[in-house]
Amino acid sequence: MQVHLIHIEMIKTVVIGGSFAGMTAAMELKRKGKEKHEVVLIDKSPLFLFIPSLIWVPFRRRELKDISFKKEAVLKKRGVDFVLAEAISVDTKLNVVTTDKGDFHYDHLVIATGPKVQFDIAPGVAEYSHYIGTPNGAMKLRSALEEFVKNPGPIVIGATQNAGCMGAAYEFLFNVEKWLRDQKVRKKVDLYWVTPEDYLGHFGIDGMPMGEAMLKGFMRMFNIHYRTQVAIKEVTADSVILSTGEVLKSSLTQLMPPFIGVDFVRNSSSLPSTPNGYIPVEDSYRHKEIANVWAAGIAVQVDLPFECKNIPYSTPKTGYPSDETGKVVAENIFRISQGRTDLKEKPWGKIPGLCVMDAGKKEVLIFSNSLFRPRVFALMLPNVIYDFTKVFIEKYFLWKSKHGYSWLP
């Protein structure tokens, strides 16, 4: 009896980056493609980190172990190969990714690399201001706050010119204000908020109904001084110098610098990218020039639908849209493997706005049918009782991610 072996040509997709967008894209593609798809995720960190909860780490409300887990076991369970390596560059003509652990060939490439933080945006930002956006930065802030309380002074919190992640800085501001009251030193501290935004509550999304009025009310209620439409000229050991010439004394400074594209993109001469290192994509998240290259999450170039008045700033790229773009990419690679040409499209600005801004055991719920205007509905709802929703979203997303339930919202 003759036995005929049927050879099934597997499609290999390499995903660079293992945070919200990368994890979702990899697991969703494997779930849809099953044995016909080989999916490899390359990341330099063994841990998945729920970044939105970093704002609680300086205040000991969370430890890093509470908001992170090893990703390899989850990926393996879902059939995704994990490679702990740093991606160095890609040759899109040869379809080869070079890492510090060797080269990887691909049929499709998904770039979900997250950001590089531009600390050199102004003199002194790297040396004298803190940054809440990394585990190391959050732990340094914890140490700085514990020293600060021994000899309180003015605090400056905010965002630099070109920044897009204003929301996390707002959250840190209100958490610091609550912490100062808990430490019984609030009356000894002048608290300043500085932002390039045209107005309070712009958030890089052109604002929300009643948002400016609400935040102005918070600033009055908590006695926080604020400056809008300002850039950072320089940060020193004990001051922040604004573009207006004003000098704010500061014993502790926390600023959100801009995000730019990672070195992997900049090192890849055959990969067309924008001047700031992001990937130009169609509404399907396929590269505008290279048919088998895709991008998801922060790596995506998002064009601003508004003009900044005086100081340039950007738009936020948060976990929910990153997760959504990862799903779109997975669906489209799967469709192409099926011979389909009808790609799913979901422009970044049309992704629903779903955000909870923590305000020091209080919260503001932000909902809209799309991130950018025009919107059918948009709502900012304060919850002054407790930050139930923020905690629930953290617990839900960690549960979902630890189990690899990538198809869930």
Model-derived segments and their meaning:
Residues G18, K101, T113-G114, T244, ...:
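Glycine-rich, N-terminal phosphate-binding loop of Rossmann-like dinucleotide-binding domains
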Residues K150-G217, H225-R227, P316-G353:
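Rossmann-like dinucleotide-binding core of oxidoreductases
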Residues A126-N151, K249-L252, M256-S322:
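FAD-site-proximal beta/loop scaffold in flavoenzymes
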Residues V3-K12, G79-E171, K178-K184, Q254:
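FAD-binding core/adjacent interface of flavoenzyme oxidoreductases
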Residues V328-P409:
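C-terminal, flexible cofactor-proximal segment of oxidoreductases
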Residues I8-D81, Q161-I205:
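Beta1-alpha1 glycine-rich phosphate/pyrophosphate-binding loop at the start
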Residues E38, K77-S89, V97, E177-I279, ...:
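A Rossmann-like FAD-binding core segment of flavoenzymes
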